[in-house]
């Protein structure tokens, strides 16, 4: 940073923008970590440690404090990764860590610091404030009661993977019946069930519907598809539909929890052309998994009024791909149609390092491609960042 | 620019190279804009404005002056894009605009300036001179009479999409019959028709045959394909064949005119292996739509003597992709086999900003990858640029 | 280099790391060039010259000294390429060339210098020393006797393309029968043959099994596949399995020798999911041909403990793709699971310029993404480079 004053200055302004985080997995009843294990239990650490040779038994069966020590002991195998960088930033910013590198020798001090810090009565608000997070979208199961949390801070979002891909599962049927009074065994019952879910969610402040989709998924109006029905209800209930396109579940069958999913690069947004044409009133906030498909996303969003670029997802959420993908979007997609970033986090503490990673890349792209190229003033670049990090989300999701 | 002296110096030399523009949609009888509506009617502006929320009615039915005002009013939604940058450069260079950003408030002044400037008797020559354009290739319908224009300045090129993809259309049949005296209903008649078209075009100075192709197109020697017949005539008549690979037409069905086409990234040049093998005497000037397929293009051009890289097309025609794609080509493809850029323009005024965009990227790549890396002198880098912008086109198209 | 002190300093340290080169085509009985024709006969030069218009007859039938002169005469058509850069570096470093550019006028002087230099009795050791090469892996035919060379310097590797793809060829059958006493006409005989090959190779110091695979290959446990059998023997004999994924053979049918192969970008590592799951004990060192598939590779290696990233192969072995691909791997894949580079060379003289190309890119990425970003000290960055260039290969291949 220090080597480039313009990037430094832009970054300093960008971090002041209060964030609307349009996609996370936060549990609003337990939004922050309680122990260091809640931090290092994040699948990025368990899967990287396992991938680098750590035995699954050490990960699964150990008591939390020992699991953390083992993870720290394995970190020297993946301390090159950005995910390690996120944790280092958490340790430094929130836990007072002052060393250069983390190792098993830091386990006790970090554990104790975490216990102390995370137990503060105002910890949740402090994390929000220090991370400059204003609103955080959730990912709620369809049968979530959505009660007992502040929906102006934690914005509900109807996650629909179970409805589209697991409705054959008796447990899912039962959950649907309990939530809606409908078993959804025929089109009429299914229609009624979905309608009740949308009524329930919008009554409780939901601002989006969301789903993750495998690479070979092709939405279609023909056949008894739940997916198409969801799009119809998004239209009726005025909800944007988050499409997270491209993930194959359980590719590595013996992987750690949440560390089993991968993808097939051979997928195309052309599979969604019929959908985008059929629902001009629905805003589709699209995430893709690969940088190659990002070129499709930038192009489809440049052409379709109802297609919006959304964040930098999972395997594309590293600076090498964020930089290339964000550059293309900023050069080709109307600035009002870009949701710059979302955290995808499970615990609030990750908002800060993840957004900082994005904001550093964004400052660099704005400096190189816009301010230095003479296309924008510094002030103009910061206003553009404000759209990406805040104002577009407010307008698109009506929050 | 100013921040990097070497890039600045290279750019200053590169802009002095007189351009051969090997692909445009210029109407030689009306090559320049007559009103500002001819500029802002370019599909890049109508599609971006529509994508950013502008009603199609405002675009289709409004009187030209009002349409321009509406477009300018919507520009603050896409003033981050390079296409906005092209227009800003036109306004500054040709229309005397001196402000920072364009808005509806500039509509009258720009309209009047355009009316005044575009009406100058020497405007066509002035644009050519100030843009440093020497020759501009056209894209002519097969039944274009090719008369009453200077074919040494505007080089005819036989566009063959209609013949390959729309020969079932009675109107196309009629046009073919009128142009050639043949209806093309059997192989013999079709052969005669195609031969007459090639005779007509080459007699009128045509220097290339061109076509755009969908992602799933696979040329084949078997079956009664017009495409294969065209390649045979390119061989016989000594014409390079421009292949623009990868576009799906009318994906966004309700899009504005020319703002409906997109693509499927899942396409490969392996589909053209049989063609490239069958016609070693024909030079294929290949454009691709995606940066991922650019790696295929660079590799196929590195191996096949008759495959030449051509320009940066459409959704790849933004600096983020031009830079990566040009770098790969410059590092891997013989320098004599690269057509650096073409304008794809409908009005001459766009030559300047589009080529400037390319020349800025080219200066940067030459500075970073060649001059600073010690692989070339500044003079050598400028000579390389001269091949890309001028000399390769002259040799390959024999102009 | 000189323009950036940090990159310069990192590079200076990185070149001191003794190299383990995990993949080459060196003939251990004739590891160095004997004439300049051995250098310029490398397919990169013959295919680029041919692609740029050089007649195959000049390449195939000419006496060596004339062929070299002709190649040099054509070099001004591809002196922009990195491959030209490798040769220029060889000429300067080993042959005393002091000029700016190479041409036919240099043919005699270079030929004579090469004759003199390559004939030195200690030339092989001198090249190894000046290139800082410690061990070089070979690519041995399955019936290679593996005798009369120093297997601690030249590490045998069982190349299995013939077994998997050409077992129907009577010549291959015969070679198999001679090498193993088995014709491999049924599963039992084939099992025995493969076992004997593994016994022979491991007894002679082989440290890997390797194969190159077409884009549509899908390994499967069902059916009488030799490939699956090889993986089983890798498990039993404790050998890593190098998978070089994505090449189509003989795409350009009239190309020069080894200058005929290309690829289809439409391939995915999902095709290997069953394999990776079935053999957790086998380390798969995976090379891919495209930068788009590199994102898959980085992701699969991040998740699967037994998938390791390996080098920058063929059409991806140019700085534009090395930089992007290496950045992604360094940000996302545990550092212990990356084989940074291999030479793929046929003559030892190419180790120096090829590794230097990689080391320059690596120094730049380490400077920009790690040291300047504050994520690593300079010393830490050099230690990371040591893993990529040496220590990971030693651990993974047990050398």
Locate predicted features.
Chain A
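Metal-cofactor-binding active-site regions of metalloenzymes
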Residues: 2-237, 282, 298-399
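A general structural motif
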Residues: 261-271, 288-295, 318-322
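Acidic, glycine-rich loop-and-beta core segments that form the ion-binding/anion-interacting portion
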Residues: 208, 214-271
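Generic beta-strand/beta-sheet core signal
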Residues: 212, 242-248, 287-289, 310-312, ...
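Short, flexible active-site loops
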Residues: 253-256, 280-285, 309-311
